[in-house]
């Protein structure tokens, strides 16, 4: 397996230190995704973390194994070779990673499903902007709704292309994410996730149109009941115009 084509390695030690110092990680189990040459790995180990690093590239795994042989031997570092979106992960508490841009979305969804205490993750700035898009605005999408339903997200700082090798064509953003209970009760998480995905897959359609298309998933009788009971303003809206409470309302009616 080779490294992701869009993987850009951090090279600025001052920025690495700044990232590693955001949280107190001494004695904590930290998951690192895409360690590359190990510059962030080293900083995490120096701060007393027990690190689990997942790397796709077998050549990089071999280099990391040589560089951190003593840390692997004493159990402070575990290396896993594979795709972080798919590979089985041992228990961890905190996530710190310079994510390859191409897996930003699937790994974020996976981490939210698994659960963690806090995550410091680096994204393409445009992706981070979409994560932070407010419900009810045009830039809002599946990513922003799911993230803001199940987590708090804060922007730490932006990074210039020169902080990486090779330099990307865009700026990057470091985000601090902490899971939380939904602001509005959700009776069935899977139904909520399915609903949000289906609504934004058909984002140019109204809620009513999409619900009727989901009769095969939920049953015509259930869909007819939900359409009958929902606020007409919600039914006539497109998904980007909805708020978190609206998604919860629709989902809970589908699961009742």
UniProtKB/Swiss-Prot annotation:
Amino acids binding S-adenosyl-L-methionine: 8, 10, 34, 55, 83, 98
Alphabetized SUPFAM superfamilies for the sequence: S-adenosyl-L-methionine-dependent methyltransferases
InterPro entries in the cross-refs: KsgA/Erm, rRNA_Ade_diMease-like_C, rRNA_Ade_Mease_Trfase_CS, rRNA_Ade_methylase_Trfase_N, rRNA_adenine_dimethylase, SAM-dependent_MTases_sf
Entry's transmembrane regions: none
Primary localization: cytoplasm
Cell location: Cytoplasm
GO cellular component: cytoplasm
Xref: PROSITE patterns: RRNA_A_DIMETH (PS01131), SAM_RNA_A_N6_MT (PS51689)
Family: Belongs to the class I-like SAM-binding methyltransferase superfamily. rRNA adenine N(6)-methyltransferase family. RsmA subfamily.
Function: Specifically dimethylates two adjacent adenosines in the loop of a conserved hairpin near the 3'-end of 16S rRNA in the 30S particle. May play a critical role in biogenesis of 30S subunits.
Protein name (Swiss-Prot/TrEMBL): Probable ribosomal RNA small subunit methyltransferase A
Organism: Methanospirillum hungatei JF-1 (strain ATCC 27890 / DSM 864 / NBRC 100397 / JF-1)
């Amino acid at each position: 397996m080779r490294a992701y084509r869009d993987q850009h390695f951090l090279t600025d030690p001052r920025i690495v230190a700044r990232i590693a110092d955001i949280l107190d990680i001494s004695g904590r189990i930290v998951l690192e995704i895409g360690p590359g040459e190990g510059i962030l790995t080293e900083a995490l180990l120096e701060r007393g973390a027990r690190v689990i690093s997942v790397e796709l590239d077998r050549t990089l795994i071999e280099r990391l194994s040589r560089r951190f042989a003593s840390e692997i031997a004493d159990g402070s570092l575990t290396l896993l070779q594979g795709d972080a979106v798919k590979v089985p992960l041992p228990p961890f508490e905190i996530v710190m990673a310079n994510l390859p841009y191409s897996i930003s979305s699937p790994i974020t969804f996976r981490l939210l499903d698994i659960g963690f205490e806090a995550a410091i993750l680096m994204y393409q700035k445009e992706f981070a902007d979409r994560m932070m898009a407010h419900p009810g605005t045009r830039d809002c999408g599946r990513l922003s709704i799911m993230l803001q339903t199940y987590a708090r997200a804060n922007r730490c700082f932006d990074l210039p292309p020169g902080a990486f090798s090779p330099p990307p064509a865009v700026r990057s953003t470091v985000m601090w994410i902490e899971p939380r209970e939904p602001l509005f009760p959700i009776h069935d998480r899977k139904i909520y996730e399915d609903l949000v995905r289906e609504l934004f897959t058909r984002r140019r359609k109204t809620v009513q149109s999409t619900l009727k298309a989901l009769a095969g998933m939920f049953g015509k009788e259930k869909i007819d009941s939900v359409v009958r009971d929902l606020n007409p303003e919600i039914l006539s809206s497109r998904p980007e115009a909805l708020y978190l409470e609206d998604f919860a309302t629709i989902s809970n009616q589908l699961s009742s």
